[in-house]
């Protein structure tokens, strides 16, 4: 057990002491109050953890990963997170879908995607990657609907220093947020602090 006045500080302290490669948080939503408490803990860990954080819904049933969605802003830091993600996906030969949701006022989405695809191709040889550019003024709702439509096994995001995409996701009402993404596991990397998963990648 972790004895600490702050749940977050206690978890982070132990993770650092043990040099943990990941933190796994279970999410059991028995009532609305518990949703808020658990959601607050998980959300705070995203920005303070020394390693990647997994948020796992209580009713998750183990199955080999087949479809992984990485919610991207098509920025350089995404490259390094995706490279770590590919190491994890490689033993399963899972498909990584790099999804960007652009608003109707954002005219550079397609240009960014082409640049990012070329950049990623130089840095990573993993074969099972595809790109999706979605248009919507309601980023959270569109992402949730996409996850439902495509039967996704894992959602991956990058916690950035300037927040950006993940802030747009987490900024919404806490209960609604938990209800939305707690249907599938969520993995969050921190910018400049994503770790390798210690798999032996074959990049097939």
Region spans (language model):
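Redox- and metal-dependent alpha/beta enzyme cores, enriched for Fe-S-associated oxidoreductases
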Residues: 79-125
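Structural beta-alpha unit
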Residues: 1-23, 124-175, 180, 184, ...
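Active-site phosphate/pyrophosphate- and oxyanion-stabilizing loops and adjacent acidic/basic residues
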Residues: 43, 86, 118, 144, ...
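Short, well-ordered secondary-structure micro-motifs
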Residues: 35-36, 66, 81, 107-111, ...
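Intrinsically disordered or low-complexity boundary/linker segments at protein termini
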Residues: 27, 42-84, 91, 180-204
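Flexible loop residues that form catalytic
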Residues: 28, 73, 104, 160
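Charged helix-capping and loop-helix junction motifs
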Residues: 38-41, 112-116, 169-175
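Hydrophobic alpha-helical segments and helix pairs
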Residues: 7-8, 13-59
């Amino acid at each position: 057990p972790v004895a600490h006045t702050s749940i977050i500080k206690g978890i982070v302290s132990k993770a650092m002491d043990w040099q943990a490669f990941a933190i796994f948080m279970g999410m059991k939503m028995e009532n609305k109050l518990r949703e808020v408490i658990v959601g607050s803990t998980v959300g705070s860990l995203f920005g303070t953890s020394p390693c990647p954080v997994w948020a796992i819904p209580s009713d998750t049933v183990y199955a080999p990963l087949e479809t992984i969605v990485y919610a991207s802003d098509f920025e350089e830091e995404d490259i390094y997170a995706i490279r770590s993600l590919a190491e994890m996906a490689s033993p399963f030969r899972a498909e990584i879908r790099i999804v960007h949701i652009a608003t109707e006022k954002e005219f550079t989405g397609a240009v960014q995607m082409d640049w990012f695809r070329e950049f990623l191709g130089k840095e990573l040889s993993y074969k099972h990657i595809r790109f999706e550019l979605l248009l919507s003024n309601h980023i959270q709702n569109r992402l949730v609907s996409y996850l439902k439509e495509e039967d996704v096994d894992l959602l991956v995001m990058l916690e950035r220093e300037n927040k950006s995409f993940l802030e747009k996701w987490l900024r919404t009402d806490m209960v609604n947020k938990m209800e939305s993404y707690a249907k599938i596991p969520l993995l969050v990397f921190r910018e400049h602090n994503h770790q390798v998963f210690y798999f032996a990648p074959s990049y097939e």
